[in-house]
Amino acid sequence: ELVEHAAAVEGIERIRLGSLDPDMLSESDIRRLAAVKKLCPQFHLSLQSGCSKTLRAMRRPYTAEQYAAIAARLREAFGDENLSLTTDVIVGFPGETEEDFEQSLRFVSAQRFLKVHVFPYSRRKGTAAYDFPDQIPEHEKEARSRRMGEAVEAVRADVAAGMRGMHAEVLLETPLSSTLFTGYTRQYLPVVVQAPGHQSGDIVPVCIGEWDGQRAKAALLAASL
């Protein structure tokens, strides 16, 4: 309801939701959100692990299968080619076996996230997990973090490559020079574009180009989309 009210405000061109737990989105919610044209088709859907056993240990209120079902509903509602998902993943949670990690790695790769924040589990006093048995050695947590990071970056590059040649609208954010800007598409793809005559805050039409490992190089289009 708040999103719908915000979309009705004149001058607001883009609405982007922050981090969401998958159990927060009902089918009705997804249908209503998909009808809001100003809502960016990008969702940061918190995952934490792609292994249901690990999710139970984390006391998350969903399984990997339930997460995948919500992601599929979002893709169906917004269009698979139009929607992008981002998430957070923890590796090395107490009790996570190599098999559990591999399962999480496969799940995360299959979801084709545009961006994944990967964190090694950090043991903190006062939390339930602090006293859990089978704590993972630091060197193993670091190794799993590297492996997960390499996998998600490969997927990120592949997803970005799939957007090459597409026309999109970019919100210009940080100026790198008087004419060169970084910015984001509605799908939260980071881009860099030469946009003489424009300034931060402008929304400009571009053609998505090559991915450089951090951003997509984009070319400014003369006409509005």
Region annotations inferred by a language model:
Residues 1-7, 11, 57-61, 123-154:
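Radical SAM enzyme [4Fe-4S]-AdoMet core and its adjacent flexible, acidic
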Residues 1-98:
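Conserved SAM/AdoMet-binding glycine-rich loop
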Residues 17, 45, 88, 108, ...:
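Conserved, mostly hydrophobic/aromatic
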Residues 24-28, 47-59, 91-98, 115-140, ...:
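Flexible glycine/acidic-rich beta-alpha junction loops that bind and position SAM and/or redox cofactors
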Residues 87-89, 101-111, 118:
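A glycine- and small/hydrophobic-rich beta-loop-beta segment
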Residues 131-225:
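Terminal RNA-binding accessory module
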